[in-house]
């Protein structure tokens, strides 16, 4: 499957160079995430190194010195596994998970060369060729302001292994087809990326791409669960009826369908917004900043419920390891933990809403979407729903948003998905 993902499909390369699928230009995000949506239905775990490689390449190109970019870009975007450099993110520490500002790993500049020392506690794809690492470049500056972003190579220019080691691998509940481990940095050589005073801000670019990828994976897994449930319901009989003909089963499948379609509408809208944002559209940048944590928050929680429902629909067989249901159920819990738990993500949504009058920006955007869609019997209901949800959001944010951030996030997610589903189908020209 690595050969299909990295070589044949070029999923980690298509956003960064031409030539994938014989195309003369880079492919837009909606193509990459559309293919990922399909690929994850057959293999979830491999999407982690794919996402890490893709997002590391993006962040390096965006903030890195041209000399460093030129040094590694061909290997990061190679479609040959023998030449490919995979990426990773080493950020979490045992006492610094969600509280990134508590990171202790420190960086020393000795004669113009940076060296990293410290322990990273949860690192996926730990044997990657390159990793983005947050480290404290000035011990006198506390919090995230003292963190700089570094690129850590597995091997030095001499070919020798860099000075860090994998202490142990994690015995995880799910995601067992890719490794996660603990890393000890022993004065490891690294390249500084961008402005040291903006290290955390730069890392958030990679984090947000990973969050979106988690949402895409959640949506893809929901689709697989739905397809499996539809197959079982159409082929299994009980009480002399097909399961699909039983009203209770129809109701359960409809709920699964609605939640799955909501996630799909959101991830593909986010893909469209990302392309516009990268092309400099300010409104799209602001909306994308909001929609990304919304997807990470809600879709990554919904997939856990959908996976459980799919297991139940298969019955006793769904609880047996011979079928795929147990693996999907275990894997489904990953997305709501990686790159921020639900509480952290919901609070991030509020931060995005409160910045630069984004509440009004988002409301105006949604009204415009509804008004530019052909008027039908649902138009007034959609506009009324916008007014009701945003009235609730404003009230809650003014009173005590910390206790209601999850309700706000869920309300906005389902409102946005409803409106995006109502949009007319658009063809993507490549």
What are these regions (language model features)?
Residues 419-430:
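Single conserved hydrophobic/aromatic residue that forms the stacking wall/gate
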Residues 26-31, 37-52, 56:
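Extended, domain-scale alpha-helical bundle/helix-rich regions
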Residues 353, 362-400, 404:
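Long, amphipathic alpha-helical stalk/connector segments used for oligomerization, subunit docking
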Residues 289-366:
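Alpha-helix capping/hinge segments and adjacent helical runs
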Residues 261-296, 312, 394-403:
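C-terminal helix-coil-helix/basic helical segment that borders enzyme active sites and/or dimer interfaces
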Residues 113, 117-161:
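A short core secondary-structure module
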Residues 1-25:
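Extended, charge-enriched "interface" segments that sit outside catalytic cores
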Residues 158-163, 167, 179-210, 227-244, ...:
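A glycine-rich, basic-preceded beta-loop-alpha segment at the flavin cofactor/substrate interface
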